[in-house]
Amino acid sequence: MSCQAFSADSFTTLAGDSLPLLMHHASAADCLPSSASTHTHNMVSAVPSGLSLLQSSKRSHMHLSTSTLGNGPPGLHYPVTPCHYSNQQTTYGMMAAQEMLSASISQTRILQTCSVPHPNMVNGANTLQGSLAPCLYKFPEHGLGGGSCSLSHSFPPLPPAVLSEEPPLGGTKDLRLRSRPPDDPPDMDSPQIRELEKFANNFKLRRIKLGYTQTNVGEALAAVHGSEFSQTTICRFENLQLSFKNACTLKAILAKWLDEAEQAGALFNEKMGMNERKRKRRTTISLGAKEALERSFREKIKPSSQEIVRMAEGLHLEKEVVRVWFCNRRQREKRVKTSLHHSSYLTKDSPTYRYPYLSPNAIKP
C-alpha cells in the first residue's frame, strides 16, 4: 500500500453517520478517515478463522453535541448532527509477525499523513465542510496505538530521572563527597603547629652546629629521595612557608637525616680528636710571680737554663712557663726601645718652620 499526501481535490463530502466510524477505539488509529480505517479493518480481518479470539469487544456510549465541536479552532466548522453511538463489536485475532509488522508500518504512514495537514486544507476549509474532522479528543492510553493521535510512540519516553534537573537522593551524597573541600589545616594554636615550629627551630640550630648549609641538606636529600628536594625547600621549611601536609611529610625525612648526620659527626670528631695535637691550657701567672720575674729580668735579660730551673722551683711554676715569659719579655722590651729610638730620631732631624722675613719697603700701602 502506498501513501500519498492528501490534497484539497482528494476529499469528498462524507455523510454524518459515516464520520465517527472508529471513535470507540482508544488508539492512534482513531484519527484515521473512513477509507483508511476500512483498509486497516480488512487487514485485521484477513487472519484465518482458526485462531482463537484474544480480546473482547468494547462498548462505549458517547454523545457528541454541536456545542462540543464548536470549541475547535476558529474557521473550521463542521455541521455534524448530534448522534448516539450504538454498541459495536470488533474482534482482533492473533496476527503473524510479518503481517503485524506490515500493519504497524501502514498505520504509521497513514498517521503521519493525517497529522500533517496540507495547506490547501486550511485555505479551503469553508468549501470542504464536513469532509474531515480533526482529532480533538484525549483517549485512554490502551489499545493498538498505545496513545493519542500524536507520533510520540515512535520515540521511547525518557526516564523521569533524566528529565528532572534535580539530582537523585543517592547522587546528592556522592556530589557532596566529591565537592567536599580538602582537609583544612589545624589552628595556629594547635599542638601540631606548635610542635612543627619547635622542630623547625631546633633543626636549624642543630644543622648550623653540625656545619651543614641548606644546600648541603638539599643535595643529600635529593640524592636519596629525588630532585624535589633543594635549598629552597629546606629554606621554606625552616621559615614555615610550606603547607601543613607537606611540612609534616618533610619533618619525618629531616628528623631521620638529622639523626644520621649527628652520628656521622660524632664519629668524625672522634677520629679528628685522635689525630689532632692537643693544645695546652693557657697558664695564669700570679701578681707576686710577675714582680719576681721582673726583678730577675732587670738583673739579667737572658738567664741560663740552670737559672730558669731555679726560678721556676722558687715560684712553683713550670720551667717552660718561665722560659716563655722571658722570651716574651725580651720581645716587648725590644719593641719599646725601637719605638723610643724612632721617635727621638724624628724629633732631632725634623726642621723647624721659619716665617719669611719681610722688609718694611716690601709692604705697599
Swiss-Prot record:
Intracellular or extracellular location(s): Nucleus
Compositionally biased residues, Basic and acidic residues: 173-183
Disordered: annotated segments: 160-191
Domain of life: Eukaryota
CC per GO annotation: nucleus
SUPFAM superfamilies: Homeodomain-like, lambda repressor-like DNA-binding domains
InterPro entries the record matches: HD, Homeobox_CS, Homeodomain-like_sf, Lambda_DNA-bd_dom_sf, POU, POU_dom, POU_domain_TF
Domain POU-specific, first and last residues per copy: 188-262
SMART domains for the chain: HOX, POU
Short sequence motif 9aaTAD: positions: 5-12
GO process annotations (BP): positive regulation of transcription by RNA polymerase II
DNA-binding region: 278-337
Keyword Manganese on entry: no
Keyword entries, A-Z: Activator, DNA-binding, Homeobox, Nucleus, Transcription, Transcription regulation
Molecular function terms from GO: DNA-binding transcription factor activity, RNA polymerase II-specific; RNA polymerase II cis-regulatory region sequence-specific DNA binding
Family of the protein in this entry: Belongs to the POU transcription factor family. Class-1 subfamily.
Function summary: Transcription factor that activates growth hormone and prolactin genes. Specifically binds to the consensus sequence 5'-TAAAT-3'.
UniProt free text on domains: The 9aaTAD motif is a transactivation domain present in a large number of yeast and animal transcription factors.
Protein name: Pituitary-specific positive transcription factor 1
Organism, as annotated: Oncorhynchus keta
